[in-house]
């Protein structure tokens, strides 16, 4: 081990690497936080997004989703519903709260889905009891580009999904594969 560092609180996301930065989500002082470290283990920056919604389990976290980058911008999503876009040096460009905007999270366990990127959008799948949907937001502005509801009935306790969608090319077009009941 070349170096290790403590996070402000339990974070369960997978770190992402972009050039000389290691980027991770974590709660910090009751807030949703995105932070970056250099290869030397020193913190480069830390940006607060909004109030944290803590994990249900003692080992859980409101920061389970992993951040993602297209090499131009960064994006992060949290259990609180906060979805945000950032510059590569951590400056907050925009944020929206999906739970305030659409519906409260009804997942039995803590959130597990992370955002994915298409050519133009940052996309999230929210699959739980009640209104479930796939929503796409403009990467630069955070404006809602489209939202598709899950339009079929699901058995009780089988309507939750914790999986991250996958963007694929299908007959020369982008398609989004979503796992869920």
Label for each model-derived stretch:
Residues 1-181:
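Noncatalytic, solvent-exposed loop/strand surfaces
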């Amino acid at each position: 081990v070349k170096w290790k560092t403590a996070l402000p609180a339990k974070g369960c996301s997978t770190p992402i690497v972009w050039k000389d930065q290691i980027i991770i989500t974590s709660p910090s002082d009751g807030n949703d936080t995105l932070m970056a470290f250099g290869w030397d283990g020193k913190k480069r920056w830390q940006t607060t997004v909004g109030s944290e919604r803590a994990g249900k389990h003692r080992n859980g976290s409101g920061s389970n989703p992993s951040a993602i980058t297209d090499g131009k911008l960064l994006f992060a999503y949290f259990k609180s519903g906060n979805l945000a876009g950032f510059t590569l040096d951590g400056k907050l460009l925009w944020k929206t709260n999906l739970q305030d905007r659409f519906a409260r999270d009804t997942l039995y366990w803590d959130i597990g889905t992370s955002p994915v990127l298409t050519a133009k959008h940052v996309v999230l799948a929210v699959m739980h009891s009640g209104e479930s949907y796939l929503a796409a937001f403009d990467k630069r502005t955070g404006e809602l580009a489209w939202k598709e509801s899950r339009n079929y009935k699901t058995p009780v306790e089988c309507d939750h999904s914790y999986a991250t969608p996958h963007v694929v090319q299908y007959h020369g077009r982008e398609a989004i594969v979503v796992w869920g009941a």
